[in-house]
Design a protein with these regions (language model features):
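His/Asp/Glu-enriched, well-ordered alpha-helical/loop segment
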Residues: 17-102
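C-terminal cap of metal-dependent C-N hydrolases
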Residues: 93-128
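Active-site gating loops and adjacent loop-to-helix segments of metal-dependent hydrolytic enzymes
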Residues: 1-16
Length: 128
């Protein structure tokens, strides 16, 4: 979490609490919230990396006022719908089968997304 927050409050206009309040207000206004849209580690920016940062981002979305299920949707079905990716973002016949099996219940405790037991990509279980 500290690493994800590392970029906030580093500029005169940076304000982490304002960022959380903005996400909350946008969500309350019905604006689709998309998770994972700014992982820019490959450009040398501190604070984010593809994959692992998403778990922290989900925690921050919950901290901003989204329910855990809404945060999970922000990383799955909402981006798929927003970008017209009909083959992903939900569990349904014919959809791309990229899944995580976790210990716990991330719909009530978002940090449980970090307790990954198994991973499937395109319907095939990956080697651990």
């Amino acid at each position: 979490m500290d690493n994800l927050c590392n970029e906030f409050n580093t500029f005169p206009t940076g304000d982490f609490d304002a960022a959380l309040a903005t996400v909350k207000a946008l969500h309350a206004a019905g604006v689709p919230i998309l998770a994972g849209s700014d992982a820019n580690y490959h450009f040398g920016a501190r604070g984010m990396a593809h994959g692992v940062s998403l778990h922290g981002e989900l925690r921050l979305l919950v901290r901003a006022g989204l329910a855990p299920t809404e945060a999970l949707r922000a990383a799955t079905s909402v981006p798929a719908t927003t970008f017209g990716l009909d083959d992903r973002g939900r569990i349904t016949p014919g959809a791309r089968a990229d899944l995580l099996l976790v210990d716990g219940d991330p719909t009530s405790r978002i940090a449980d997304t970090l307790s990954i037991r198994d991973v499937w990509r395109s319907g095939s279980r990956t080697a651990r």
